[in-house]
Design a protein with these regions (language model features):
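Extended accessory regions or peripheral subdomains of proteins
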Residues: 15-61, 67-106, 142, 146-241
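FAD-binding glycine-rich core of flavoenzymes that anchor FAD
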Residues: 109-130
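Exposed boundary/loop context
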Residues: 7, 73, 127-131
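ATP-grasp fold ATP-binding core
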Residues: 64-66, 132-133
Length: 241
């Protein structure tokens, strides 16, 4: 397999160090095509909720809290916004939203669409990150059980809501409450060895843009948007890693 050309390039921005560095990134690109790149910053000025306020731009966002034993907050909180892809279903109809375009399909198993979409990615684990560092985050409604079990016909729906709804974003924030640190992660998609440098640059730029928003003062009133997802760890589906 051809390898990335790493002889001339190591990416830093001022004093900002990204993990993995470019040489290690190229090595990882030989094992898979989705490599997480991250920067770590102190969490002394932000909480998951305050960061959510700064990142939410009125589109789709999520705050995913980890729970231990169903009663105690876990170590990590995960935040994401502005998804690249949205997958939602109602009955046998699945809609895939990407770049503002909506594609509809009639299927027997809506979850198979998520698996099919993610099958083109081979994520690579990077030291220093928890098991979850990206993937499809969302919910499954009660009626989704009809795709797994032979049940009587459903009663007419009283709510105009989707049976399932998943967001896929390539960049997320990981709050580590034990170490009081935030890891800003961007999953770089390497389509070919010649794409390594561009993919790494783009990931680093996305990370810096998010950190810039975190460090900017938050002004004005804010309320939870109607399309924000507040989730617990039991609702993770097909997490990378």
């Amino acid at each position: 397999m051809p390898t990335c050309d790493r002889s001339h390039y190591l990416y830093y921005l001022g004093a900002h160090v990204f993990f993995p560095d470019y040489a290690a990134f190229c090595d990882l690109a030989e094992k898979g095509n989705l490599i997480p790149v991250y920067r770590e910053i102190m969490a002394d000025m932000d909480t998951p909720v305050s960061a959510f306020k700064k990142l939410d731009n009125g589109t789709f966002s999520f705050l995913l809290e980890s729970i231990e034993g169903g009663e105690k907050w876990g170590r990590y909180s995960f935040l994401g916004s502005n998804p690249d892809v949205i997958i939602r279903s109602k009955g046998a109809c699945v809609e895939i939203v990407s770049n503002g375009a909506v594609t509809s399909r009639t299927v027997t198993d809506p979850l198979a669409c998520i698996k099919e979409l993610l099958a083109g990615y081979t994520p690579v684990e990077v030291e220093g990150l928890p098991r979850f560092f990206g993937g499809a985050v969302g919910y499954l409604g009660y009626d989704m059980v009809r795709h797994f079990e032979n049940l009587p016909s459903a009663k007419p729906a009283l709510l105009d809501s989707y049976d399932s709804y998943f967001l896929i974003t390539d960049t997320i924030l990981i709050f580590d409450t034990v170490r009081q640190k935030i890891k800003v992660v961007s999953n770089a998609h390497v389509t070919s060895p010649s794409n390594c440098e561009a993919a790494y640059r783009e990931a680093c730029s996305k990370i810096d843009a998010i950190i810039g928003r975190l460090r900017a003062p938050h002004t004005g009133m804010w309320s939870m948007p109607h399309n924000a997802l507040m989730l617990t760890s039991i609702l993770i589906s097909h997490a990378c890693g």
